[in-house]
């Protein structure tokens, strides 16, 4: 699975590189009229992006909030195409670490809605997404769960992982716009792993079945 993902990322990177080369070639051959059209196009894109940002902010993006129940989650999934949702439990200390990082990322990535739900108070949603380990972060795009970050295994198996590491991991789902290299994790130093038992809740979790339609 890791090799497949690596090959896919490599292919995507090569495609992007080729597209950039083609764009640079076109820029070299532009005249004044072409440059004017390009500037006008860029202005329209900036205006569209600003309108999107305003809509995102009206829908609660930019802040990390708690959802009261399943109904609020499903309502939000209709308004926000990108969702980063932390399933937590009050008794799990590691959830506080996740809260700290997601609060930072929520302000940085307004294109996604960052939120959390209490797994014990949302049994229907927790079982539907087959959440078993706490903390788990569900990554939703266009009303479909694309990926899950289960515990801290993907974050270096340490409690003091960098926010950039979590950002990089979230970006693999496409739920946020990421400017870095998806093929290379951030170069951060970590302390030795503190082995703590992961909290589990009833129900199963299957990481291979990650494309669950929330509209059903």
From Swiss-Prot:
Record note on disruption phenotype: Viable, but males are sterile with seminal vesicles of reduced size and lacking mature sperm. Sperm fail to mature past the canoe stage. RNAi-mediated knockdown in male germ cells results in disrupted spermiogenesis.
Alphabetized UniProt keyword annotations: Coiled coil, Differentiation, Oxidoreductase, Spermatogenesis
Catalyzed chemical reaction(s): [thioredoxin]-dithiol + NADP(+) = [thioredoxin]-disulfide + NADPH + H(+)
Domain Phosducin, first and last residues per copy: 29-163
GO molecular function: protein folding chaperone
Enzyme nomenclature, EC number: 1.8.1.9
Superkingdom of the source species: Eukaryota
Coiled-coil intervals: 13-59
Tissue: Highly expressed in germline cells of the testis from the spermatogonia stage until the early spermatid stage but is no longer observed in late-stage spermatids in the distal end of the testis.
Xref: Pfam families: Phosducin (PF02114)
One GO BP annotation of this record: chaperone-mediated protein folding
TM helices/strands, residue ranges: none
Gene Ontology cellular component list: cytoplasm; cytosol
Role of this protein: Has redox activity with thioredoxin. Required for male fertility and maturation of sperm past the canoe stage during spermiogenesis.
Entry's family note: Belongs to the phosducin family.
PANTHER family, per the entry: THIOREDOXIN DOMAIN-CONTAINING PROTEIN 9
Name the record gives this protein: Phosducin-like protein 3
UniProt lineage: Eukaryota, Metazoa, Ecdysozoa, Arthropoda, Hexapoda
């Amino acid at each position: 699975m890791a090799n497949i993902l690596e090959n896919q990322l490599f292919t995507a990177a090569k495609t992007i590189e080729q597209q950039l080369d083609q764009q640079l070639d076109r820029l070299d051959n532009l005249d004044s009229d072409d440059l004017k059209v390009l500037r006008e196009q860029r202005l329209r894109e900036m205006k569209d992006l600003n309108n999107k940002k305003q809509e995102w902010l009206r829908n609660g993006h930019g802040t990390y909030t708690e959802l009261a129940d399943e109904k609020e989650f499903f309502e939000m999934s209709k308004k926000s195409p990108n969702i980063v949702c932390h399933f937590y439990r009050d008794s799990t200390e590691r959830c506080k670490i996740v809260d700290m990082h997601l609060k930072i990322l929520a302000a940085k990535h307004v294109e996604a809605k960052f939120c959390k739900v209490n797994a014990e108070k949302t049994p229907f949603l927790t079982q539907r997404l087959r959440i078993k380990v706490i903390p788990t972060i569900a990554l939703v795009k266009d009303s479909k769960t694309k990926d899950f970050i289960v515990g801290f295994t993907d974050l270096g198996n340490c409690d003091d992982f960098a926010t950039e590491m979590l950002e990089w991991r979230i970006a693999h789902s496409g739920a946020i716009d990421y400017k870095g290299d998806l093929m290379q994790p951030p170069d951060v130093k970590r302390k030795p792993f503190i082995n703590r038992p992961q909290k589990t809740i009833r129900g199963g979790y299957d990481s291979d079945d990650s494309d669950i339609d929330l509209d059903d």
